[in-house]
Amino acid sequence: MNAYERITRNTAEVVTEEEVRELAEDPEGKRVYVGYEPSGVLHLGHLLTANKLMDLQDAGMEVVVLLADVHAYLNDKGSFEEIRATADQMKAQFLAYGLDEDQTEFVLGSSFQLDEDYELDLHAMQVETSLKRAQRAMAEIQSGETPKVSHVVYPLMQALDIEYLDLDLAIGGMDQRKVHMLAREELPSVGYEKRPVLHTPIIGDLGSGDGKMSSSEGVTISMEDSTADIEEKVTGAFCPQTRDPEGETVNPVLELFQYHVFPRFDEVVVQRPDEYGGDLVYESYEDLADDLESGELHPADAKGALAAALDELIEPGRQRLREIRGE
């Protein structure tokens, strides 16, 4: 796997391919970031982008994790005191999950977003950006149904963060796409260069395969979940014997294998009794998905292997969270 393939694997969109190929020619020391609102315990949505960050560290890039306390405050996620306490927990969980501490810089948003130069640039972007453009960028990620003035400022700050953190590449889920496109369009208007962007997929709701896996709606898996919790949630997951269910529905079990399990494990062992053919060993997602579609791999057996793998991935962060809480 060459540098470009490693940088872009398991992404939903590369903006632009030409720019990222140029970056991949010499990735050593290049700076890449993801920003997270400190608003709860890490869940599989956070960890999907963390998997991509680990790919980029393997390619030699330096990772910046923005713990966006000001953004979280603007998005009604609590007081600054509450948000910053959560930020400390998130940092510990990310490191326990597998981010290389020597290659990861954790930055609190308020450490630079309240400085005069940043504020003046923010005002300049406000002059250059239409209200409708900012509202469109924020629509998918705002909290609550009532638009607020803070929600319009939020995406402009995300755009400026890319400049002020001295980044070469930005990462986010597809729900961040409109914000990143705004950044590429508007940063040049205030004298800064646009940066390339990678977008990771949005995994479907575990229970239905519709919409997206969410910590606020439907079923998701987080570092608070016990082994039994994970087994219960995965056992009840939607898993038709196909990669491509009808309509906009997806197979979340296969998505979790593709985006969470195979990037972290060299092989996946599906345990089965001898009378049902014995264990199956997979070294690639494609082989596992093929067997599910052919009927060689039963959904119940696939779910058992998935639950075991997710539990192993989450265990270090779960243990760290318990230590922080004194449990």
Curated annotation (Swiss-Prot):
Gene Ontology MF: a single term: tyrosine-tRNA ligase activity
One Pfam family hit: tRNA-synt_1b
Compartments, record wording: Cytoplasm
Matches recorded under InterPro entries: aa-tRNA-synth_I_CS, aa-tRNA-synth_Ic, Rossmann-like_a/b/a_fold, Tyr-tRNA-ligase, Tyr-tRNA-ligase_3, Tyr-tRNA-ligase_arc/euk-type, Tyr-tRNA_synthase
Amino-acid positions noted as binding L-tyrosine in the UniProt annotation, renumbered to this chain: Y33, Y154, Q158, D161, Q176
Motif ('KMSKS' region): 212-216
EC annotation from Swiss-Prot or TrEMBL: 6.1.1.1
Residues annotated to bind ATP: S215
Matches recorded under SUPFAM superfamilies: Nucleotidylyl transferase
Gene Ontology process terms (BP): tyrosyl-tRNA aminoacylation
Reactions it catalyzes: tRNA(Tyr) + L-tyrosine + ATP = L-tyrosyl-tRNA(Tyr) + AMP + diphosphate + H(+)
Protein origin, superkingdom: Archaea
Sequence motif: 'HIGH' region, positions: 38-46
Keywords: Aminoacyl-tRNA synthetase, ATP-binding, Cytoplasm, Ligase, Nucleotide-binding, Protein biosynthesis
GO cellular component, one term: cytoplasm
Cysteines joined through disulfide linkages: none
Top EC class for this record: ligase
Family classification: Belongs to the class-I aminoacyl-tRNA synthetase family. TyrS type 3 subfamily.
Function: Catalyzes the attachment of tyrosine to tRNA(Tyr) in a two-step reaction: tyrosine is first activated by ATP to form Tyr-AMP and then transferred to the acceptor end of tRNA(Tyr).
Self-association state and partner proteins as the record states: Homodimer.
NCBIfam families per the UniProt record, alphabetical: PRK08560.1, tyrS
UniProt xrefs under PANTHER family: TYROSINE--TRNA LIGASE, CYTOPLASMIC, TYROSINE-TRNA LIGASE
Protein name from the UniProt record: Tyrosine--tRNA ligase
Protein's organism: Halobacterium salinarum (strain ATCC 700922 / JCM 11081 / NRC-1) (Halobacterium halobium)
Gene from which the chain derives: tyrS
